[in-house]
Amino acid sequence: MPHRAASPAMSENEFDITNALFQNDGDSDNEVPVTKSKPQRKAAPQELDFLGGNVDDDDEDDEAFIAEQQTSANRKAANLKGRTVKKGGGFQAMGLNANLLKAITRKGFSVPTPIQRKTIPVIMDDRDVVGMARTGSGKTAAFVIPMIEKLKSHSSKFGARGLILSPSRELALQTLKVVKELGKGTDLKSVLLVGGDSLEEQFGMMAGNPDIVIATPGRFLHLKVEMNLDLSSIRYVVFDEADRLFEMGFAAQLTEILHGLPTTRQTLLFSATLPKSLVEFARAGLQEPTLIRLDTESKISPDLQNAFFSVKSADKEGALLYILHEVIKMPTGPTEVAQRLQEEKANSKDSKNSKKRKRSEMDKAVNMKESPTKHSTIVFAATKHHVDYLYSLLREAGFAVSYAYGSLDQTARKIQVNNFRTGLSNILVVTDVAARGIDIPILANVINYDFPSQPKIFVHRVGRTARAGRKGWSYSLVRDADAPYLLDLQLFLGRRLVLGREHGDQVDYAEDVVVGGFPRDSLAQNCEWVTRVLDDNRDIFSQRTVATKGEKLYMRTRNAASLESAKRSKSVVGSDHWTTIHPLFSDAETEMEIQREKMLARIGGYRPQETIFEVNNRRSGKPENEEALHTIKRVRSTLDSKKKRAQAEEQSELLEDASGGNEGEANGNPDAMSDDDIPDGVPDNMSMASESDLEVTFSSYSQSKSDKAKKDSTAAFQNPEYFMSYTPSSTNLAEDRAYGVHTGTNANFTQASRSVTMDLQLDEGARGFAEPRTMKRWDKRHKKYVSRQNDEDGSKGEHLVRGESGAKIAASFRSGKFDAWKKSKRLGRLPRVGEAEDTSLSAGLNSAMGGKRFRHHKDQAPKRADPLRDDFYKKKKKNEAAKERQMSRAGGAAAGGKSEIKNTDDIRLARKLKQKRREKNARPSRKK
């Protein structure tokens, strides 16, 4: 029987099913016309042989027919052109329903991004996932698409089924927008719970039985505690920007929320980096998670060239300006895009166009999809104070600069990053925390103004350049205190360390770690300009003072380098090649500078043969103090003898090393002389002896007696059958140094996350997750020092209570507002999880939920009527009506008015007072 052809056909090329989805849809954006294919010849029906007389013949015919059909289908798909051909691994191959595919096409997604292609199939298999992806990589759709596919439609049973936690209000709004757009073909209800909105409105949302809850951790925990929510119905949980969640201090809230979730949930965690605290959280809250990380982000590109410059602390600003001016050739003044925008603005002022027309002209001048220019450079600084200082200094130098750091307002940060992406600025000064989620598609240069404290942070920084086959450069400023970290990086990368010009100009910047200094004259000119600016501009000088204080705190809190690198760095920094001019500078002026440095080194290394006492006596000709001269000569002779002995010992060690090297060459050098290369005049007894002759003649001596005895004593108690070493038997140093995730299927999350864990230093000196807080403050009320924990965990000094998980939460979360809201709405018990929902309840409480648009119901005080406007009396009447509505809504008497309708308590009180008056009036008079 011949080999059966593969079925179904290989998904090398797939047909576009968009036309099938949009057959009766007039809003389709598919411009490819539908062409009718020619009818294919169908095989004649085969006669069925129930007795099994010719089963083999039928099987062979079926196999031949299937193979022919597959071959023709593949041939036709290969000949198709345009948008009708989809590569394998598209959204159609993921098993999504037709409504969701239709929404994806309307959204504009044609091909899944790499993180979507890797993540969605794993999520569809009901596995917990830890995904590492930057902002802009499509990670929002990577977890929203499987969530909509799993939830499918609105459930008639009470209880939310999907939960998405975001660190900020803006990100939550963005996620809600994506959920609304991708869930258009379904009746799923989604709500947004963020701080700043009305609690009463959010009570109504949660009582309306939503399917998907998108919230910030603080507000969601507040509602959970206030409403006593049961989260046992949650099936799908997403922690979006998880590293940002921990940095913003939501660790306690996340722990409390996680404690209330069911164990059968599916948990997804997306982050740009993977700090140690996040790894511990994932191990505790996720069940056998799968780590998904793009391989291109885990290693340095082979097209990236690195240059390291040794510099003093006082010359760092001048060195930065020298790199921008002389190395990168950064132009000053406005960029080309900015000039184009100014021209478009000038043209729009001259022409009488509408506002819409002006906006279109500005969009033409600034193309949002335009990639950064060849001069685009990111400068990494240690703290936000350094960012402010460098931004002001570079602006003073005439460069077009943008900046970003962690505590910058979200809107301002977006504006600054967009200016850099569109080419309005050439330089972006950022911290590691702020740059974590920034995705720049094409970048030319990276400058490490402050050297990173971990090798993985260096890889994370320089990984933004040299992408898609393009060349890129990274320039790093290394002080003497940063030398241990440089050596750690050199060992981590496994590359050769080249100091100065010790190897000449034969260096490879892509494969070597090349360290050198700057030309002194050019560097001095830039340093003098910086000094002059600091003297003239007091604002920049004050910013530098603040940055210096912030640097002291940063130096105390950054990770320590390895002990071996710290020891080795002393000899590296003390060598003459540490400050030699970098091989990157190879012009005529540089050569003159090199010769001058050599001359200064010779002068600095000069040691006279006589002391000053001997020189003075020789000049005068009359020895004044012969005893002192004899003492000096005797000391010199002693020192000379010691020096000669030291030189002799050093020479002997060199000879021993040389002899050992010769033995190694004799054993392993393929270029060594063999027996066949011996000349004819040399006797045969000079040829190499065999191993058996050497064993018989000489005793093997490989180690000292003490080492041998130690080894024997160690092996004496080791039983190879039961002995278990503390080191793994299959240790591979090359694999330990690898950048990417360990090979395999990443089934072991602990092992897979070990190579990608990276802690970023916070840019404000704030403490991270699980770091102890020792600072205290004086409590005036209790007359004692108390911890600042209560001031910074969201409670603002209020009383704390223990939650269900044992974590501290603010006591204000249990304020009774939900009970008061239910009483005002005249509601009884809400349905429990699993019970049938009350449709009238959800429709009456929140009309905005589940609609096409999300509406905020926020009460604002009316603006005061302006007497100078024509509509003064109209506005005044409207304001008075609004005040009356507010007074009646507030409860009448509480707002200053009297309520005309009495409730049961008022009636009962009035009856009691009336009865007292009757009893009082019915008493007999005291008069006799």
From Swiss-Prot:
Question: What positions does the entry give for ATP binding?
Answer: A133, R134, T135, G136, S137, G138, K139, T140
Q: Where is the Helicase ATP-binding domain?
A: 120-292
Q: One biological process GO term for this chain?
A: rRNA processing
**Signal peptide start-end:** none
Please report, in chain numbering, the residue ranges of the motif Q motif.
Answer: 89-117
Molecular function (Gene Ontology), one example: RNA helicase activity
List locations, semicolon-separated. Nucleus, Nucleolus
List GO terms (cellular component aspect): cytosol; nucleolus
Instruction: Identify the residues that the record assigns to the Helicase C-terminal domain, covering every copy.
Output: 361-515
Q: Where is this region: Disordered?
A: 1-46, 342-368, 616-713, 780-802, 833-928
Which protein, by its recorded name, is this? Answer: ATP-dependent RNA helicase dbp10
Q: Where is the composition biased (Basic and acidic residues)?
A: 342-353, 621-630, 789-802, 859-887, 899-909
Does the entry annotate any disulfide bonds, and if so which pairs?
Answer: none
Short motif DEAD box, span: 240-243
Recorded hits in Pfam families, A to Z, give: DBP10CT, DEAD, Helicase_C
| EC primary class | hydrolase
The residue ranges flagged as biased composition, category Low complexity, are 657-672
**Domain annotation text?**
The Q motif is unique to and characteristic of the DEAD box family of RNA helicases and controls ATP binding and hydrolysis.
The UniProt gene name for this protein comes to dbp10
Family membership, please give it: Belongs to the DEAD box helicase family. DDX54/DBP10 subfamily.
**Which keywords appear in this protein's UniProt record, sorted alphabetically?**
ATP-binding, Helicase, Hydrolase, Nucleotide-binding, Nucleus, Ribosome biogenesis, RNA-binding, rRNA processing
